[in-house]
């Protein structure tokens, strides 16, 4: 990703901004603005924590396991193009979010931004949609962790493994260790994917025990694309690519978690732009590099890709390793996948509790959820969200597990609706800046690629198309599935229904561009910001480069 596409203004953003707009020029927001900047949350998350929180939220089973079925559906080139297309959308969402949240790093993240720059009704809709998304993924990740353990021991009831994982996840969040634990969890995941990419290159070049050079062999036979569902010609290849695109969309969901953590970030005006700018670049490198190597290592017609084991045996990396005759690595990779699921569950509880906290401080959830401990932990929100982890035990019973699966599947579309909302908020945000004569270059972070909200419009258009055609496969001959149709399209209709219903009941109005408040709360945010001395040692400089 070229560095000329974005720049990080090194000047003090608040100084530049106040030269253009004074408090007298701005229309103050609602009286809850004081809650934003005087919230009970504490800014305890360092730069390295912020970088790893966003990375940890997206690098996981989608890359390690989900790419297997994507390869089977689209072929090696279809796999790469699908993830590249979705990566471009992820990039646009992140630069939109980065400009806004770096300027206003407030508790509630994009939920509060929706209230401030669009409409309280959108904040209500996005907040509850986001809370549901992560509070339901939480038990799904706990169930996945138990299945991963089954690779080593399938004689013990999964309820025990779920309980152990749940206790650890709740303890991490209640004791305030989330940032530090997520840093180490995410580090393991990054080392794993980097190691797998390097190993994949070695195997492809013939460096495995069998010394067989693969090269682009599988791009020639069975070919770069898969004819989806046996449909011949260009249409079959395009449908294979589109199947990958919808799967890739769900793998990238989670990059926006950094916005929810912004209200707890130390020195946010400095650390958030750095974290956001570096995170999406690394995600694209890991995903695009990983999918390209996978397309070289495993043929798209390999029978192992059809496995539904839920553990490392279904990973295309493991399939390639076993093909190369390396016996020990599958268990090691499974251990890394287990830490990935554990990390994701911890992140899910953190994100859902902060989303609920954000709803509470905007008076769109009971006030009790905004209570915090002296250490700044929203303990009631954490406790309430942790209760939903008990849904993971539903997966132990076939009927209940099927019902739970339906709820889990709803989260994929809900995540894309969040991205759609972020892009829409940015369009209004950018409109407000232009109307009030505020230069985007005065913001702590801005991207030249997002001129006149072009990146936001690209994101909205692409996400809308993906959402409308997410369940297209059910319309193929003899392929109808009511559950697939409902779980893909229900969130698409619930989102506007919630928005319109809240707007009608509460009589809310769109915030006019000329009345948007770009001032309230800045003084407290500026007080949290300070210059940091650059590292002087070689090790320190290397660490700063990584983070």
Task: Name each model feature, range by range.
Residues 106, 129-143, 247, 252-265, ...:
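Membrane-helix boundary/coupling elements in multi-pass transport proteins
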Residues 112-114, 119, 225-231, 244, ...:
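TM-loop-TM module centered on a large, flexible mid-protein loop between adjacent transmembrane helices
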Residues 184-185, 214, 371-377, 419-488, ...:
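C-terminal membrane-solvent junction of multi-pass transporters and transport-like membrane proteins
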Residues 42, 52, 63-160:
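Extracellular loop-to-transmembrane helix junctions
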Residues 111-116, 142-162, 259-269, 274-281, ...:
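Helix-loop-helix connectors at the membrane interface of multi-pass transporters/channels
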Residues 40, 156, 187-328:
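Helix-loop-helix junctions that connect adjacent transmembrane segments
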Residues 1-68, 72-77, 90-91, 95, ...:
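Membrane-interface "cap" regions at the ends of multi-pass membrane proteins
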Residues 160-220, 253, 276-280, 408-421, ...:
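Membrane-interface loop-to-helix entry segments
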């Amino acid at each position: 990703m070229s560095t000329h596409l974005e720049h990080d203004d090194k000047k003090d953003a608040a100084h530049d901004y106040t030269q253009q707009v004074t408090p007298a020029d701005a229309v103050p927001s609602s009286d809850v603005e004081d809650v934003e900047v005087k919230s009970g949350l504490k800014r305890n998350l360092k730069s390295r924590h912020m970088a790893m929180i966003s990375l940890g939220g997206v690098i996981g089973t989608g890359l390690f396991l989900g790419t297997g079925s994507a390869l089977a559906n689209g072929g090696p080139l279809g796999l790469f193009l699908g993830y590249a297309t979705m990566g471009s959308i992820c990039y646009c969402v992140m630069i939109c979010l980065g400009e806004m949240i770096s300027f206003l790093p407030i508790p509630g993240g994009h939920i509060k931004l929706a209230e401030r720059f669009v409409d309280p009704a959108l904040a209500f809709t996005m907040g509850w949609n986001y809370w549901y998304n992560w509070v339901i993924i939480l038990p799904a990740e706990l169930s996945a962790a138990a299945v991963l353990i089954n690779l080593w021991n399938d004689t013990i009831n999964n309820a025990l493994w779920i309980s152990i994982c749940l206790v650890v996840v709740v303890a991490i969040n209640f004791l305030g260790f989330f940032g530090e634990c997520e840093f180490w969890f995410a580090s393991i995941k990054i080392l794993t994917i980097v190691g797998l990419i390097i190993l994949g290159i070695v195997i492809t070049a013939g460096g495995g025990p069998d010394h067989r050079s693969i090269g682009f062999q599988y791009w020639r036979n069975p070919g770069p694309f898969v004819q989806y569902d046996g449909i011949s010609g260009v249409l079959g290849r395009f449908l294979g690519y589109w199947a990958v695109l919808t799967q890739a969309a769900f793998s990238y969901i989670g990059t926006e978690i950094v916005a929810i953590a912004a209200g707890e970030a130390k020195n946010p005006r400095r650390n958030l732009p750095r974290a956001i700018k570096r995170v999406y670049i690394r995600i694209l490198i890991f995903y695009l590099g990983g999918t390209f190597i996978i397309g070289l290592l495993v043929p798209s017609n390999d029978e192992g890709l059809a496995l539904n084991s839920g553990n490392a045996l279904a990973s295309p990396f493991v399939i390639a390793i076993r093909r190369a005759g390396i016996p020990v690595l599958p268990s090691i990779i499974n251990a890394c996948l287990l830490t990935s699921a554990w990390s994701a569950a911890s992140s899910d509880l953190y994100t859902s509790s902060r989303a609920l906290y954000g709803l509470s401080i905007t008076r769109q959830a009971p006030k009790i959820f905004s209570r915090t401990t002296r250490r700044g932990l929203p303990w009631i929100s954490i406790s309430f969200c942790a209760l939903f982890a008990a849904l993971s035990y539903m997966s132990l019973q076939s009927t209940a597990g099927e019902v739970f699966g339906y709820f889990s599947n709803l989260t994929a579309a809900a995540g894309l609706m969040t991205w759609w909302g972020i892009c829409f908020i940015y369009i209004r945000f950018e409109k407000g800046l232009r109307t009030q004569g505020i230069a985007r270059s005065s913001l702590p972070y801005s991207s030249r690629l997002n001129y006149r909200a072009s990146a936001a419009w690209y994101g909205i258009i692409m996400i809308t198309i993906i959402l409308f055609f997410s369940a297209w496969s059910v319309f193929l001959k003899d392929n109808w599935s009511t559950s697939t149709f409902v779980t893909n399209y229900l969130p698409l209709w619930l989102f506007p229904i919630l928005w319109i219903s809240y707007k009608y009941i509460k009589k809310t109005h769109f915030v006019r561009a000329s009345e948007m408040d770009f001032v309230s709360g800045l003084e407290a945010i500026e007080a949290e910001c300070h210059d940091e001395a650059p590292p002087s040692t070689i090790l320190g400089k290397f660490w700063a480069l990584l983070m």
